[in-house]
Amino acid sequence: MAAKDVKFGNDARVKMLKGVNVLADAVKVTLGPKGRNVILDKSFGAPTITKDGVSVAREIELEDKFENMGAQMVKEVASKANDAAGDGTTTATVLAQAIVNEGLKAVAAGMNPMDLKRGIDKAVSAVVSELKNLSKPCETAKEIEQVGTISANSDSIVGQLISQAMEKVGKEGVITVEDGTGLEDELDVVEGMQFDRGYLSPYFINKPETATVELDNPYLLLVDKKISNIRELLPVLEGVAKAGKPLLIIAEDVEGEALATLVVNTMRGIVKVAAVKAPGFGDRRKAMLQDIAILTAGTVISEEIGMELEKATLEDLGQAKRVVINKDNTTIIDGIGDEAQIKGRVAQIRQQIEESTSDYDKEKLQERVAKLAGGVAVIKVGAATEVEMKEKKDRVDDALHATRAAVEEGIVAGGGVALVRAAAKVAASLKGDNEEQNVGIKLALRAMEAPLRQIVTNAGEEASVVASAVKNGEGNFGYNAGTEQYGDMIEMGILDPTKVTRSALQFAASVAGLMITTECMVTDLPKDDKADLGAAGMGGMGGMGGMM
């Protein structure tokens, strides 16, 4: 076991605080409408330019191990805020730094760290309750646009795109962010249910100019197994040919003789058929086939429930208004499924989302909900260079998470005003069990001004003057750093999601409280490289002797 380096008391806290300040100072320059960029060097490729707090925090590793421990703990604050609300990482870092700095001053003055921590926890709990009282629902398209704009660092086009996307696919819908091909940002909405499986043979194509298969009013045959024998398919094919409608086969796979016969029939015009693989794998494939069945009022032909493909009839087939297939995707538009059954299925999947503990599973289940409920929106981010594209995608991603958080828990006045108002409201009535807890309460409430002060500092103004003016105001009165004007923050469109502000404060206080109560730090002693080199050199000499 390696030898350890141990530091106690003030020595440990000074080192830890230095690490906290290095990381927080790097992150906080990005805060607010006039926040600056940070350039991150990469081991290969061009450097990344970002205004995303958590991206900056993740890059920072310090050489001194004690300082690095402090930095890593603040990094945890940014990561947790990002995981919980998808935004507010810089605010969380600024709050953590302010609470740790104030707290360690009090500890150095001889206060009891545990009582300070209890005071901080009381203040945070009271302010979180007050934030919920200040919160108002985020319902209109305009409010959603404003939240998106603020989170994308005052990029109004991003705010508009997110608002339009939510209008098209609903607030629960899936909105994804992809690289665009031009310079402009675009919104692409996929109506109906789309899954990432294309046609099994290019000979099915009936629209050569777009290289797609288009089927109008088709039947859909859903099969939970591989089809390789054409005899199994003949009864269904004959029924569909008599009905004079096209057929889409969705199965685990269609291969060999079965696929060849379908292609020949299609080319001769005997029956219009296309085949695609079923989406997903394993249990997820079964579930997605069932989703398609409910959407199109069909039945999944599965041997697990005693159904055989040879005995399938037209009643077992689903129907839709239109199906479009290209080499990568299949889109089913306007399935004839019963509305009540579709809603029941959506409710069932939502229940699974509630119970799931895996983020990946939740994401996949959310996608299924969106596909059943009516569509997926894709925001295509345009930029002149790849470096700009990465930076912009980060901002769009943040804005998307922030708007979701706003829809979930509502909005409060932005620009750090909500924390100042909530802190002022609880300051008069909140009391600790002893004087040291009261000091903890006061230092936490004072630290809650830090985001407002940092936004103002980044805008090149005097933080104390603005903070004093905002504190003397009432309600949503605050300072718009973008236009350098005072006024009603909500009317000016400067909004923050309540969830983002709440999460930032809770995570910052949690980690800051642990750091204030730290009395000892332990790390590995660095290895003595010189000794290792000496030993290696001696070995070399011995080798030379052998050669003599």
Swiss-Prot record:
It is found in: Cytoplasm. Keywords: ATP-binding, Chaperone, Cytoplasm, Isomerase, Nucleotide-binding. One of its GO terms (biological process) is protein refolding. One of its GO terms (cellular component) is cytoplasm. Its main location: cytoplasm. One of its GO terms (molecular function) is ATP-dependent protein folding chaperone. It catalyses: ATP + H2O + a folded polypeptide = ADP + phosphate + an unfolded polypeptide. It holds the Pfam family Cpn60_TCP1. Its EC number is 5.6.1.7. It is an enzyme of class 5 (isomerase). ATP binds at T30, L31, G32, P33, K51, D87, G88, T89, T90, T91, G415, D496. HAMAP family: CH60 (MF_00600). NCBIfam families: GroEL, PRK00013.1, PRK12849.1, PRK12850.1, PRK12851.1. Together with its co-chaperonin GroES, plays an essential role in assisting protein folding. The GroEL-GroES system forms a nano-cage that allows encapsulation of the non-native substrate proteins and provides a physical environment optimized to promote and accelerate protein folding. Forms a cylinder of 14 subunits composed of two heptameric rings stacked back-to-back. Interacts with the co-chaperonin GroES. Belongs to the chaperonin (HSP60) family. This is Chaperonin GroEL. It comes from Haemophilus influenzae (strain PittEE).
